[in-house]
Regions:
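RNase H-like DDE/DDD metal-dependent nuclease/strand-transfer catalytic core used by mobile genetic elements
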Residues: 1-150, 207-256
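Polybasic, proline/glycine-rich intrinsically disordered low-complexity segments
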Residues: 170-209
Length: 256
């Protein structure tokens, strides 16, 4: 499981906070493009050197052009507001799952080298992590900040735009003058060059070798809902998933 996130550097609004089963650049780009439907396009982004950010960086460079410097890269330690967010995400969301998974491993319930166990873990817990992240994001974006006169991050984000409502800042005009935007051609330059982006940090998350058919997937989702309550922190649901999917393999062996 991989967590990808983005925070607005001015207001501290969490723009997106997602859990997925891979660390691929297209996954991050999908989260970014989904977020701009709510928060619109930023004028500039700051990322670390991870290759998972390469498509977002390419997208921004293609949209604004290389000369406007829309992408700043560097060690994440310099991105202090994002680092503070990650600290709280771990403390209030991820540490619970972190401890739970280690407990499952210590009790021989989870074998991290077993593909079936990893498949079941992702099936049950990715939706649960997503729910927890969504709830955290809602609370974070609406909590009062003493440094901002007790305005929430979302209030600060909104106030920031209207403070500069009379300016010609592109990012402000894009939000306030939505009727003037041609969304069919917004940010598209078919004749522009594709920028070359170099990165030095590459974390590879291998994909599961277990691939269920559509019929098997439907049977699994009908039988076991990841978010249903089992009064065991999802452990019983995980064990049921292991047994249920294992039956598919037993059936394949018998039929062959």
């Amino acid at each position: 499981m991989v967590i990808h996130g983005c925070v607005d550097g001015f207001s501290r609004v969490i723009v997106f906070l997602k859990c997925s089963n891979n660390n691929e650049a297209l996954t991050v780009l999908e989260s970014f493009q989904s977020a701009v439907n709510t928060f619109h396009y930023p004028r500039r982004i700051r990322t670390d050197h991870g290759t998972e950010n390469v498509e977002v960086a390419r997208f921004m460079l293609h949209k604004y052009g290389i000369t406007t410097n829309p992408v700043i890269t560097g060690r994440s330690i310099h991105n202090q507001r994002t680092e503070r967010m990650w600290k709280d995400v771990f403390a209030y969301v991820l540490q619970y799952f972190y401890n739970l998974f280690y407990f499952m491993e210590s009790q021989d319930i989870l074998d991290p080298d077993n593909e079936l166990h990893l498949f079941a873990l992702q099936y049950i817990y990715i939706p649960r992590v997503k729910w927890a992240l969504d709830y955290f994001t809602l609370q974070w974006n609406n909590h009062p900040m003493s440094t901002q006169g007790n305005k929430s991050p979302l209030q600060s984000w909104t106030a920031g735009f209207y403070e500069f409502a009379e300016s010609n800042y592109t990012v402000v005009r894009d939000v306030l003058d939505v009727d003037t935007i041609n969304f069919d051609h917004y940010g598209i330059d078919d004749d522009g060059p594709r920028p070359q982006i170099e990165t030095s940090n590459n974390v590879v998350v291998p994909r599961s070798t277990i691939q269920l058919s559509m019929e098997e997937t439907r049977a699994l989702t009908d039988e076991i809902s990841p978010l249903s309550e089992d009064n065991d922190n999802g452990v019983h649901l995980y064990q049921r998933t292991v047994a249920f999917v294992n039956n598919f393999f037993d059936s394949d062996v018998e039929s062959s």
